[in-house]
Regions:
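Membrane-integrated ABC transporters
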Residues: 1-44, 57-67, 85, 89, ...
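Primarily ABC-family ATPase nucleotide-binding module
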Residues: 327-378, 411, 455, 524, ...
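Cytosolic ends of transmembrane helices, especially the final helix of ABC transmembrane type-1 domains
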Residues: 198, 202, 214-221, 245, ...
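Helix-to-loop junction immediately C-terminal to a conserved catalytic motif
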Residues: 395
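Transmembrane helix-loop-helix hairpins at lipid-water interfaces of multipass membrane proteins
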Residues: 27-81, 88, 160-165, 263, ...
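Loop segments that connect adjacent transmembrane helices in multi-pass transporters
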Residues: 102, 106-123, 194-242, 315, ...
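ABC-family ATPase nucleotide-binding domain "signature/switch" substructure
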Residues: 389, 422-430, 438-441, 456-460, ...
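A hydrophobic transmembrane-helix motif
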Residues: 44-50, 142-185, 241-290
Length: 582
């Protein structure tokens, strides 16, 4: 069982809270252990000051042993705290990963079908993996580095205790580091935003090219396809080089900062010590400076670590922007929607108007269709007239701009659309066949027996083909059914639609690749089911026996009647029939 994401996620911090829910005590323990480790680290500068100012000048062996034991105990304690912190961080990190990734996948699969029109498969994949990258960016190592860097800033207070003048010098160097970090991070976020968008485009194009490789071969367009990919890839490489250049510049700066800081620090320290000696002031002395230098070393190391970590963490910004459409998307399922109950097969489209975009053309304009239980209804018309859009509306993939869709007198907008779909047998024009066995593809997750799968195969005229396969119903087929013929693929999709014996069957060009004998078998099987059938087809033999034929042209319903009635009228349908008979 995996927890679903909350209905709306406002920002990346909410994702972190969701992933670490139940591990708040571990996070607090990580912070406390980091603080204790930092406090133990502050013992070293003070012990150094006592060693130089008291133990060595006075040849105090007992004090020397005491300081040594304190430093050993400090090192052991700091290591123990660090190990415990790492274990707890790993536990939190694994918990976040095991909660977030399934929850985001669950959200993606539950989004409305209209959402997927806006993104290619490759682009969606990069957006999906962006959540995993965010989690990785906020990994335990990053958290520990960030906490250690923040806590190391406590040494700044110790520096002011030893010498406020040198502490101000350290503050000035820190200010320079902050400016460099802000500027470089701004540039990186801008470049990484472009890179993430480019990665999505490249992945989308790559998947399209792989899926369409046979079409590229037929049209001899491999060169143009490679040129299109290479253009995007070269831009990606350029952005990657720019990002690497900025990262390297920041790394060089952070490597040079401690060295330059030490040089400046020693120069100012010599000045301040000479001034103290000339005036007889008891201010800065050698022991105090060595202690200050130890505290400053920890402080400047924390500053550089913080600079590097902040730069990495800000890389979350473009990743979050990529992931937002998924994690902030509205799930299709709505617990407030009503259960449709057992559908009898009555369907009504009442004055439906639909367009895919608000500023786009009307796809359907005032279309009304009435289907009684058990009727066989056909929808025909020229290509692009809006026939397949009717199916998308019936399946709840799209929402009409105006008008209503009824199942058994119930408005689809108020029904649990997933419960409606479970009672439909659907064969879409672009139906997909998954990699797996014939049985898996026919059942498609439905709770049916092997015998019921065989019955569906017989009804679709596919049983004889399956019996000739090496492993029968358990024969593995490739993704997309590339090792099946076009007719076998269509019959497999038809068997999938009929396996649960639905009361409503929607078929979009489902028999275009079948011969007359096989189509007769399928038609006879559908008649025996006594189900409501709504069929889109250009094939005359498929729709000849329809109870009613609806003719759509340019999104408008222009004719309704039986096959013979429409042919006798001499309208659009008659012209479509004449065109096929020529």
């Amino acid at each position: 069982f995996y927890r679903p994401l909350p209905p709306f996620v406002h920002h990346a911090v909410e994702l972190f809270r969701f992933g670490t829910r139940g591990y708040e005590k571990n996070i607090i323990a990580v912070i406390v252990l980091g603080l204790l480790g930092t406090l133990l680290g502050m013992v070293t500068p003070q012990a150094t000051a006592i060693l130089v100012n008291d133990a060595i000048p006075d040849s105090d062996r007992i004090l020397l042993w005491q300081i040594g034991l304190v430093l050993v105990a400090t090192a052991i304690g700091k290591s123990a705290f660090g190990m415990a912190q790492a274990i707890l961080s790993l536990r939190v990190e694994n918990a976040a990963d095991s909660s977030l990734q399934p929850a985001v996948w669950d959200r993606l699969l539950k989004l409305k079908p209209a959402f997927f029109r806006s993104y290619s498969s490759g682009d969606l994949l990069t957006r999906l993996m962006a959540v995993s990258q965010i989690r990785s960016q906020l990994s335990g190592a990053t958290q520990r580095t960030l906490l250690s860097a923040v806590f190391s800033l406590l040494n700044l207070a110790l520096m002011f205790v030893y010498s406020w003048q040198l502490a101000l010098v350290g503050m000035g160097l820190t200010l320079i580091a902050v400016i460099v970090t802000v500027v470089s991070s701004t540039l990186l976020v801008r470049k990484e935003r472009q890179q993430e968008a480019g990665d999505g485009e490249i992945n989308g194009l790559t998947i399209e090219l792989i899926n369409g490789v046979s079409k590229l071969r037929v049209s001899a367009a491999e060169g143009r396809a490679f040129a299109a990919w290479a253009k995007k890839y070269s831009h990606h490489i350029k952005l990657k080089a720019d990002i690497k250049r900025i990262d390297d510049s920041v790394s060089v700066f952070n490597e040079a900062l401690p060295l330059v800081s030490s040089i400046l620090l020693f120069w100012f320290a010599i000045l301040f010590i000479e001034m103290a000696q000339s005036t007889g002031d008891s201010g800065l002395n050698m022991g105090t400076f060595i202690a200050f230098n130890s505290a400053f070393g920890t402080f400047i190391s924390g500053v550089t670590d913080l600079s590097n970590t902040v730069t990495d963490v800000l890389g979350i910004v473009p990743l979050w922007e990529r992931a937002k459409p998924i994690v902030q998307g509205t799930p299709e399922s709505d617990p407030t929607k009503a259960d449709p109950g057992r559908l009898t097969g009555k369907i009504v489209l009442d004055r439906v108007i639909f367009r895919y975009r608000e500023d786009g053309p009307l796809i359907l304009n005032d279309v009304s269709i009435h289907v009684e239980p058990g009727e066989f209804i056909a929808i025909v018309g020229p290509s692009g007239s809006g026939k397949s859009t009717v199916f998308r509306l019936l399946l709840g993939f799209e929402t009409p701009a105006s008008g209503t869709i009824y199942y058994d007198g119930q408005d689809l907008a108020g029904l649990d659309v997933q419960a409606v779909r479970r009672q439909l047998g659907v064969v879409l024009q672009n139906g997909r066949i998954n990699s797996g066995s014939m049985f898996d593809n026919i059942t498609c997750g439905a709770l049916v027996t092997l015998e019921e799968a065989w019955e569906a195969a017989r009804m679709a005229g596919l049983a004889a083909d399956i019996e000739q396969m090496p492993m029968g119903m358990h024969t593995v087929i490739s993704e997309g059914g590339t090792n099946l013929s076009g007719g076998q693929r269509q019959r497999l999709l038809i068997a999938r639609a009929m396996v649960v014996k639905p009361k409503i069957i929607l078929m979009d060009e489902a028999t275009s690749a079948l011969d007359n004998r096989t189509q007769a078998i399928v038609t006879e099987s559908l008649d025996k089911l006594n189900a409501t059938r709504v069929v889109i087809s250009h094939r005359l033999s498929t729709i000849r026996n329809a109870d009613r034929i609806y003719v759509i042209e340019s999104g408008r319903l222009v004719e309704v009647g039986s096959f013979e009635e429409l042919v006798c009228r001499g309208g659009l349908f008659a012209r479509l029939v004449a065109r096929q008979l020529e």
